[in-house]
Every structure is written in structure tokens, then in C-alpha cells.
Amino acid sequence: MTEAPVSRIRNFSIIAHIDHGKSTLADRLLQTTGTVAARDMKEQFLDNMDLERERGITIKLQAARMNYRGEDGEEYVLNLIDTPGHVDFSYEVSRSLAACEGALLVVDASQGVEAQTLANVYLALEHNLEIIPVLNKIDLPGAEPERVKQEIEEIIGLDCSGAVMASAKEGIGIAEILESIVHLVPPPQDTVSEPLRALIFDSYYDPYRGVVVYFRVMDGTVKQGDKIRLMASGKEYQIDELGVLSPAQVQVKELHAGEVGYLAAAIKAVTDARVGDTITLATAPAKTPLPGYEEAKPMVFCGMFPTDADQFEDLREALEKLRLNDAALQYEPETSSAMGFGFRCGFLGLLHMEIVQERLEREYNLDLIITAPSVVYRVTPLKGEVFMIDNPSTLPDPQHREKIEEPYVQVEMITPETYVGTLMELAQTRRGVFKDMKYLTPERTTLIYELPLAEIVTDFFDQMKSRSRGYASMEYQLIGYRENPLVKLDILINSDPVDSLAAIVHRDKAYGVGRALVSKLRELIPRHQFKIPIQAAIGSKVIASESIPALRKDVLAKCYGGDITRKKKLLEKQKAGKKRMKAVGSVDVPQEAFMAVLRLKDE
């Protein structure tokens, strides 16, 4: 490894919207600097999980150290710190930006600026990063670099006269990008003599070494064998292994201010070394931790149940293993009368939920039932403390509570002008409050709405994409809780409430949702030997009901002619039997019924 003085280190990240070519650009940089040998090169080199490759998104952060000889003949060390581009992971993005001094803003020359790019650029500006605009995919026939340059200048206010024209796929403009990193990104501050402070920007669990922590040294020096303390959790560890990532791990003896590396210190779980925590020496600790640390707060909750009750322990183990790698995932055991034993899980957002679900099914071969996602409500009871609930079935009765508040988010949608009407209609049907509308360019518009988070977690994103033919993009952030007339909608099957189908809905929408739910269930629950009523109720008031008629055997088949009383006797006997059955019989609710409830909101 080249030893580099602080003045020749450059730490940068790449900001880009999904599909604008960030991973391909990272591949080219690794190749051009000779960090990864040509024969080892594969597409999306830094995206390690199969899921990341398949969806073409970056989920976990990666880092890579590149040695680069500049045109001035000096040897530089460039540290690329990768960021996830999706809104669910914005805290991780802010931590990895805090570890950098500069950022490449990669924009697709045929598409222009998207909502998530904007959100991340603002984050980068908050951290005072030097931003270098790069127009990617200029080899495409539909590329309009001049229009996109103007768009970046108008929307973000960045001077684009020096923007690099590039095509990561064809390898055009890569040399210019490397030179502009060296000349424009400022070197880290030279604080080698101060007490050690290092920022954790990612960590993952390795079955042999425990948790491996990726960090950037902000002040001071760290050596192999040092005893370190994590300032937020207060725990102390001895460093077993210290090294740099070129993307493969290479051990080194020490790292100083400005450098990026990894360490292993027999840490048991990722929750002990959280993203954003500060590492310092146990013997000579720093006075204050680095700013900006936050606990990850789940926003979306759902129940996960194994379809086969015997798999409950397997599900517990799988969640424990995922939790080792994913500090934002929360779960606790839960039982449901309809589904048996399972877990109530909390996620950062919908994408995070889908990814966890997919990893459980794919990597651990589990068959899962997922209940409808819900958000965290704040309930003020008549007596006692305010408390939070994430499961609709635990909501207290109206006579015991004063008010319910739900979380609201501010949503920014960037869309071509043609789709403004249909997206405004979508936001209004989801109880959105219109706040602002800005024209970014004559063709592109930003719509700003305030919406309840509960209206977004189901399928708002999919609806927005389908209404705008895939051209709109969105970004949201929490703005606090607001009181609304919310009610708990219970679904009763054969007079028994099914807890997994309960939902908290707005009073004005309760009838529509209840009616749709019962008619859907009527189609899906198979007929039994007795009549099954299906009802949607608020408290004790039934607002919608359907019934599934009983299957009947033709008991009169053996009577040809004969007396009517004989027939009546047989029919009465059948009726009495059905009545007895209804009292003791239990109704089988098939798996599809629960899935249909999830899909119901899409229709």
C-alpha cells in the first residue's frame, strides 16, 4: 500500500439516482486506477448481494481505496465511499457523506435531475462537500447534455461550466473525472496529533471475526492492538485486525487522520457498533463524539408468520442473523389467533421491508405470510401516559382514549409536466394537502404535498410510477404527528374478529375499505357446511356485511313421491345439524385472503 501524507488523500462519494450509472462508474474507476485486475472485474463490482445486482440498487455501503498517479506525477490515495441511493436509507447516506470531503454528482444526460438525487445533494451541501457534476451516458442517442447542464444549474445552483462529460459504460471521461477529484476535492484536515476520533459509516457481521467495522479516521491515529471505546454504546474492545479496503481487505499496521479502513475486534453484534458512532482510544479518549449520531427508528411495521408453524424457530434464527447485519431491523414475538406464532417487525421503509422479506425467503428458504404494513400511531388515553402503537389490534376502545395522531410526511414528486394532473389527483385521494408547486424547467415540475405516512406505505410509489409511465420520482421526510378522526376497522368472520385483518383507517374512508374487504373475502373463503357471515365493524357497529351460503347435500333425493311431512322432517333435521355445526365449526381462512387484503389497496 502506498503511504500517503494527509495532503494527498481524497475522500469522495458518488451521488446518483437509481439507474443513472453509479455502480458502472465505480467499476470504471477501480479498473482505470488498476485497483481491481481486469480478470477479476465483474459488473457492479461493489454491489455484493445478489439482490443488489438483480434490482440494480446499492443497499449496503461499500468502500474502496484506489492509488492514482496524477498528471502532476504525484501519488494520490482516493477513497471512494459508496452510498445507497434509496430514500429508506437516508441516514446511512448522511453518515457516509460525513466521511467525505467531496462528491461526484452523476446525472443521466438523457434523463435529468431526479428527486432522490436532489435530496442527497442537499445532504452533501449541508456537510460542505465539494460537488463535481458528471453527465453520464453521453453516448446514448437521446442524450441532451446542454439541457441537463442548464437543469442542474437552475435546480441545484451548481456551476456546470466545468461538468465532466462521461460514459461509464464506454469508458469516456474517466481520466477527467480522476483529475477533477484530485484538483477539486479538498484534502482532509491534518489533525494527526489530536486524540483519536473515527466515524463508523458501515458495519457487517462476519461469522469468523465478529463484526467488521468500516470507518473514516477524522482525528489522530489508530494502530493494530489498540484498545478502543465506542462512544455511543460505551463498550470497549481490542483491535485484532486493522486494514484498508481496496475493495478486498488488506491488513495494515496503522491508519491516520483522513484515511478510510476497517477493523475487527471481536464485536458480537452490529447493534454494538452502530453507523454514526465515534471510535476513540480507551486510554486517551476524545472529549466529545463526532456530531450527527442517531438511533435508527423504524417507520413501517408488519407481522411476519411462517406458513408452516414448525418453521417458527427457523424464522427466529433467520431474523437474528439478519439483525446482526442490519441495525435498523427490529422484531418481537407476536401471536395471532388466525396465524399462530410469528414476529412483529419494524423497518425503515417499504423498500427495506421488501428486501428483508425477500432475503428471508431466498437465503433461509422460509415461506412467509406478511400482514398489511402499518405505521406507528400516537395514542393519548383518558388516563395515563401517551403511548405509541404499531399494531392496529392493540388500539384501545374509543371510550378509553382521548385522541389518535398519525405520522405525516412531506412528499416531493419531480415529474414531467404532462403528468402533473394525474399525480395531484393521486395525492388528493390519499388525503394529501397541497403545499407548493415549482417549475424546475418548462417541462419538469416539483409537486410538494403533506400526506399521512399510512397512505404512502402501501402502494403510493407504484401508483405514482404507473400514472407517470415511470418518469416521476419521489422523496419524503417525516414532519411530525397530527390528530385525525381515525377508527379501528375490525373484520369478523363467523362472528369472530380476525386480529390480522384489523386496520386503522380514516373515518371517511372506513365504509369504502370495509365494503371492499368483505366482498373480497367472500370470493376467497371457500364454502363450508354452514353459512358464514363476514362483517366489517367499527366498535360494535357493523358497517358492511356479506355471507357465504352453506354447501347443502340434497337430502330429498331418496324421496320420490310421498307425503310432504316426510320431506319437511328431513329438511328440519338438516337445518338443525347445520345450526349445531355453525356453533362449533371453525372457518378456514386461506393464505390468499390475507394477501388479497394487501393487494386491495392497489385496486
From Swiss-Prot:
It catalyses: GTP + H2O = GDP + phosphate + H(+). Keywords: Cell inner membrane, Cell membrane, GTP-binding, Hydrolase, Membrane, Nucleotide-binding, Protein biosynthesis. One of its GO terms (biological process) is translation. GO terms for molecular function: GTP binding; GTPase activity; ribosome binding. It is an enzyme of class 3 (hydrolase). It is found in: Cell inner membrane. CDD domains: EF4_II, EF4_III, LepA, lepA_C. Signal peptide: none annotated. Its main location: membrane. Required for accurate and efficient protein synthesis under certain stress conditions. May act as a fidelity factor of the translation reaction, by catalyzing a one-codon backward translocation of tRNAs on improperly translocated ribosomes. Back-translocation proceeds from a post-translocation (POST) complex to a pre-translocation (PRE) complex, thus giving elongation factor G a second chance to translocate the tRNAs correctly. Binds to ribosomes in a GTP-dependent manner. NCBIfam families: lepA, small_GTP. Belongs to the TRAFAC class translation factor GTPase superfamily. Classic translation factor GTPase family. LepA subfamily. This is Elongation factor 4. It comes from Cyanothece sp. (strain PCC 7425 / ATCC 29141). The lineage of its organism: Bacteria, Bacillati, Cyanobacteriota, Cyanophyceae, Gomontiellales.
